[in-house]
C-alpha cells in the first residue's frame, strides 16, 4: 500500500469529511474543520516526518443497553485512523469474510441480519417443520477479554509490514497491556468483526453448517440433529478457547427451535404454520423501562432536556416497530406518558399534602414488560 493513499493530503482530507459528520457541533471538531487546509497539512507533515504524536483518548462508561467502557479519540487522531482503517485495514480484513458475518460492514447491519435469520427459519421449516434445534453461543466479555497477542497476530498475517506497523502503533498507544479493548474506535470494531473469521470458516467449511449467522460475538447454528449440534458446540468452544475467549456456560446452549430464539434484541418465533414472528425480547423491554424512568427523573430535575428523552424513546420505538409489536407499542406509549404525569402528580402531591403523610413514587408498571412476545 502506497503511503500517499493513507497519509497523503487528499486521503486525510477525505477522512476528515467523513469524521465530521454528526459531530460538527463539538468545539474541537469545529475548530479543526474551519481550519481544515492548515490542520490537515500539519497532520500530513507530522505523519510523513515521523513527528506525529497521538493524544490520549477520553474514557467513559455507558449503561444502556448494558454497562460498557468506551474510548473517545481526539478528532485529529480519528482523522488519521479513519484513513488508515478505510484505505487499508477494512478492505484487507473483510476480504476473507463469509457472507453471514453481519456486523459493521457496508450494506449489512442489524436489520439485514434479522431478515437473514427469518430467511433461515423459513428455509428450515420447508425441509423439517419445527422439529429442529439451535446452538447459541455467548462469549464472556468479548472486547474486555480480547487477547492483544491474538489480535496483533491476526493483523500481522494479512497486512503489509508498513501498514501493520501503523496499526500496531495505534493499538499500543491507546490500549496498553496484553488484554482487553474498549469498542470506541473503528479500528477496534474491525478487530471485533475479524477476530472470529477463522471460526466462521471452520463452522461453514469443516462442520458443514449451512444455517449459521454471526453478528459480532452473537452467533448461532440451526440443525435438525440435536446430538450433532451438541458435538459442534464442544468443538466450537475449544476453538474459542484457542483464541483466548471464554464462553458463558449457562447462556451457551442447545435448545429446540420451538422455544424461540433471542437475537439482536428480538425473540424469533417459528410457528407451526411456518410463519416467523418477531417480538421485542423481555430483557430489552425491561431495560428500556428502567432507562426511561431514569431519564425522565433527570429531565424533571432540569439535568436533561425533555426533547432528548423524547428522542431516546422515539429511537427505541422505531427499533421495536420492526417486530410484531403493535400491542407492546401501545402499552409502552401509555407507560412513557404515565412517567411524565406521575412526576407532575408527585409534585402536586408534595404541595398539598402535609409533611409525613405523603406516599412514595410508585412505578406505573413493574416487570419485564407486558407487550407482545413476553
Language-model region placement:
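Non-catalytic, polymerase-adjacent accessory regions of viral genome-replication enzymes
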Residues: 1-41, 347-374
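Glycine-/proline-rich flexible loop or hinge segments
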Residues: 19-30, 60-71, 98-100
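Conserved polymerase palm-domain catalytic core
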Residues: 39, 46, 118-216, 220-239, ...
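Reverse-transcriptase-like RNA-dependent polymerase core
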Residues: 45-66, 79, 160-174
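Conserved pre-motif C helix in the palm subdomain of viral-like polymerases
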Residues: 67-98, 177-205
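Right-hand nucleic-acid polymerase module
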Residues: 73-74, 82, 137, 170-177, ...
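Active-site-proximal segment of RNA-dependent polymerases
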Residues: 85-144
